[in-house]
Amino acid sequence: MSDKADAQFRIGEAAWVVILMSVCFGFSYLDRNVLTILTQPIKHSLSLSDTQLGVLGGFAFSVFFFLGGLPLAWLIDRTNRIRLTAACIFIWSVATVMSGLSTGFTQLLVSRAFTAAAEAALIPAGLSIFADMLPVRRIPLASSVLMIGGFVGGGAALYLGGTFLTYFSSPEAPHWFLPQLLPWQHVYLVIGLAGIVPVALLLLTTKEPARREILDVDKEVNENAPPIREVFSYLFVESGFYAPFILGVCAIFVVFYSVNAWFPAFLIRRFALSASEAGTYLGPAFIVFGIAGSLGSQLFLRRLTPDNIVPRIVLLLGGICLVQIANLAALPFATSPSIAVCVYGIAVGVTGAVLSVMLVPIQLTVPNRMRGQTMSIAYCGVNLLGTGLGPFLVGFLNERLFGGGATLGMCMAAISVSSATIATILFARSYFVFTRQRIAAKPTEIITSGAQQASISS
């Protein structure tokens, strides 16, 4: 990066922003993922069906994530991203508290909707900030650190959610505070109120970076961001690469969210574990395997050059799909919680690798004023299709075809293997399109151009 860019953000300051955004992402996953460990008590206290639980954990969340993501993407490309992120964290924290005050399906649905819409800003805003404050060679590592926060938060949701649920179910809990609430409602209140911490840290310790183009880091970006229809046209009409790539990422996240949403219930129903025991198994596995996968992808990226980073990432994602197919096909045959958790850990680990690299091609190839909207489109697509279809289809399939019994493992395997197969085909398509376009392009038109190589080596 140029001296001018280096002067704006010193190494320590940039590292703090990356770490803090990772912490914020951890809080977002804590708020959204705690539902998975509270599924059984919520199901019983509110008399919900598996389909309704699938709607809460999947379809409804993803729809409002998508609806909130597009206008927030417009704001990311035009406004102060630090303040916008802080405002969204405050909103989803309040919504989490309201989830704890819900007494029926509709109230919980509305609270989840606000949580989803507000969380849609975090990843696009964070990655957009990183692209404007870091050298290109540091962006994949920063993205990996950001995604690690999600695994820490998701694992904390499972472990702390189960622990808090046990605590608030005990006589030692402070039942004088809102005594009419059930234990699972108290868990939501505690987690929601904790959101004040990252809001304060963002507003008091960070500043907004100037916007810069990746391919010309000395050039300030002042032109207006294009409307969303032009961004869609660029991604899905003018380029043949982005459509199968983004849809492939969405398909592989159908796998992850299917497993993530229902695995605690699977352990509880299949092996008669308590919520606390399931959280004790899954929380550490989520953190350890997720971080290992995320960091492992960085070892892969360190071997790449500016000329091959995009196609090699696509190949990596295709290989991950094959691993998921083999791994999750074995889930129905797990004979103990330990074996099941190993399958879960592998699924989470390879997802960690996906999360760390999936948006790097977009960061490196899309123009600055389209970057926030493009990453938001991709991330909203992941949540609309991944979060929306995965949990819903598992719950629907289990309830309608198997009567809602202890067949969740079979349902998760069926949805996961099918989705991973589709993702493999889509990544193969995007790889061949990208390779063909590179061969046909003039040297100055290649996406990963010499200008980008110069910025990476600086």
Predicted feature locations:
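Central cavity-lining transmembrane alpha-helices of secondary-active solute carriers
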Residues: 58-73, 284-297
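Cytoplasmic helix-loop-helix junction between adjacent transmembrane helices
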Residues: 111-150
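Helix-loop-helix hairpin linking two adjacent transmembrane segments in secondary transporters
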Residues: 146, 150-204
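Conserved MFS/SLC helix-loop-helix module at the cytosolic interface between two early adjacent transmembrane helices
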Residues: 67-105
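C-terminal membrane-cytosol helix-exit motif in multi-pass small-molecule transporters
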Residues: 166, 192-217, 425-430
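Helix-breaking motifs and short loop linkers at transmembrane-helix boundaries and internal kinks
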Residues: 47, 80, 101-107, 135, ...
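Extracytoplasmic gate region of multi-pass secondary transporters
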Residues: 35-36, 238-294, 355, 359, ...
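Juxtamembrane intracellular "pre-TM" segments in multi-pass secondary transporters
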Residues: 3-11, 209-244, 270, 450
